[in-house]
């Protein structure tokens, strides 16, 4: 088992050394899923560090920013414990045109945002997906926890245009996901189920000290359990964290 601990500074330094790698020339799709701690800007850096593999697994899928920008693997697995996120992805797969039409018809409005954010999400999977994505794209802080967030607004960038552009990008995003297995599992079960000598795991867990921004109720003990599990796997793993005394330990 090979376990790489990567922080932002190390990733950037290593990326400069590996820019000649062929995989860096792959032009992927930018995920429209806004996500706290997402790796949109570090995706190419992380991709450049990946070893050759047959099965690619993201136990903490989140916004899928690395998955969608990398060259497809023979087997790909996206997993997340967030039921609303997974419901949106599955709805996008099964009802793409209807979902996009519903989202395109919505206006960027503080009134709509405040009304929907104060209400429970609908029980119907389709309506739930529509509202969830609208709130995610208009939320100031794109967290998936119970923490409240204000409405995105500003004078430099049009939030309305940004939202509509994201809906357009969902079409290519859905096409990229067609070859991906989408799971709703605890990260431990996901790792154990897909572990093999040909598997590469991208491990992007909740950050230490920022656990409240994510679902799952992570604690210091959870981080330790993840480290213990990764020491036992047959495959390879790349772990992303910010520097912290607990992680250094």
Region locations from a protein language model:
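Alpha-helical elements of the RecA-like P-loop NTPase motor core of helicases
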Residues: 44, 68, 87, 192, ...
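Binuclear metal-ion centers of metallo-dependent hydrolases, dominated by the metallo-beta-lactamase
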Residues: 242-249
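Charged helix-capping and loop-helix junction motifs
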Residues: 218-224
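Short amphipathic alpha-helical segments
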Residues: 70-72, 90, 195-196, 214-215, ...
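SAM cofactor-binding core of SAM-dependent methyltransferases
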Residues: 48-119
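SAM-dependent nucleic-acid methyltransferase catalytic core
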Residues: 2-41, 49, 93-202, 206-213, ...
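Conserved beta-strand signature within the Rossmann-like core of class I S-adenosyl-L-methionine
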Residues: 235-240
């Amino acid at each position: 088992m090979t376990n790489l601990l990567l922080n932002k500074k190390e990733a950037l330094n290593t990326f400069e050394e590996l820019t000649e790698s062929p995989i860096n020339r792959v032009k992927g799709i930018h995920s429209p899923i806004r996500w706290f701690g997402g790796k949109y800007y570090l995706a190419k850096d992380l991709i450049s560090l990946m070893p050759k593999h047959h099965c690619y697994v993201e136990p903490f899928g989140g916004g899928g920013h690395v998955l969608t920008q990398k060259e497809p693997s023979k087997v790909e697995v996206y997993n997340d414990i967030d039921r609303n996120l997974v419901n949106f992805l599955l709805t996008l797969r099964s009802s793409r045109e209807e979902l996009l039409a519903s989202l395109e018809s919505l206006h960027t409005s503080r009134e709509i945002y405040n009304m929907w954010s104060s209400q429970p999400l609908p029980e119907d999977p389709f309506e739930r997906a529509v509202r969830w994505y609208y709130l995610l794209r208009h939320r100031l802080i794109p967290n998936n926890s119970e923490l409240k967030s204000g409405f995105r607004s500003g004078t430099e960038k049009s939030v309305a245009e940004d939202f509509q552009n994201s809906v357009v990008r969902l079409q290519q995003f859905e096409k990229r996901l067609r070859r991906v297995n989408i799971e709703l599992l605890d990260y431990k079960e996901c790792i154990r189920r897909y572990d093999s000598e040909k598997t590469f795991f991208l491990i992007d867990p909740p950050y230490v000290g920022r656990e409240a921004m994510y679902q799952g109720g992570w604690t210091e003990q959870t981080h330790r359990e993840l480290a213990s599990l990764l020491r036992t796997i047959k495959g390879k793993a790349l772990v992303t964290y910010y520097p912290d005394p607990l992680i250094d330990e």
